């Protein structure tokens, strides 16, 4: 899986969960028929949002994105559907080209983030476990902090 494929899949997943959450919000606040859509898709969207943000940082390290581009990629997860726009914008500028430069036989890592990435690329099963644990831990923190907006209605 290339940086482009990883990033695109999560950008599309993030936009899709936005659509599902917005549908749930219409059902809850517009038609007042059910809160189930917000309860289910809110959680799903939160998990995918976190995964997208982690993947953005992971790809940014590999692609040597500037802080500005990385921040734009992260902020694109906030407005609905902007992750897909950012994905296309980054691809048009060749910001998602190539493979994993720090994979075995590739460049030697120089910074701490690059060393972490090289370790993860050399151990994909362990990396997947670390990624899942990171998403779970950040989701737990988000649940403890509470929803981004008041849930009273």
Language-model features and meaning:
Residues 137-153:
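Juxtamembrane boundary at the C-terminal end of a transmembrane helix
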Residues 95-121:
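Membrane-interfacial, low-structure loops and terminal tails that flank and connect transmembrane helices
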Residues 71-89:
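Hydrophobic, aromatic-rich membrane-embedded alpha-helical segments
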Residues 48-61, 83-91:
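Membrane-cytosol interface at the C-terminal ends of transmembrane alpha helices
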Residues 20-33, 52-61:
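Membrane-helix exit/interface motif
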Residues 34-49, 153:
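Loop-to-helix transition at the N-terminal end of transmembrane alpha-helices
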Residues 11-21, 49-52, 128-135:
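Core segments of transmembrane alpha-helices
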Residues 115-136:
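Individual transmembrane alpha-helices with interfacial aromatic-anchor signatures
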């Amino acid at each position: 899986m290339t940086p482009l494929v990883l990033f695109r899949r999560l950008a599309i997943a993030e936009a899709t969960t936005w659509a599902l959450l917005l549908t749930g919000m219409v059902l809850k606040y517009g038609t007042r028929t059910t809160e189930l859509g917000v309860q289910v898709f809110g959680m799903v969207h939160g998990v995918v949002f976190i995964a997208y943000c982690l993947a953005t940082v992971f790809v940014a390290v590999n692609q040597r994105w500037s802080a500005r581009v990385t921040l734009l990629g992260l902020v694109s997860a906030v407005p609905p559907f902007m992750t897909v726009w950012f994905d296309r914008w980054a691809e048009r500028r060749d910001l998602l080209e190539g493979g994993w430069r720090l994979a075995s036989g590739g460049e030697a890592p120089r910074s701490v983030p690059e060393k972490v990435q090289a370790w993860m690329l050399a151990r994909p099963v362990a990396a997947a476990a670390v990624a899942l644990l990171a998403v779970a831990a950040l989701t737990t923190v988000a649940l403890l902090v509470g929803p981004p907006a008041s849930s009273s209605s």
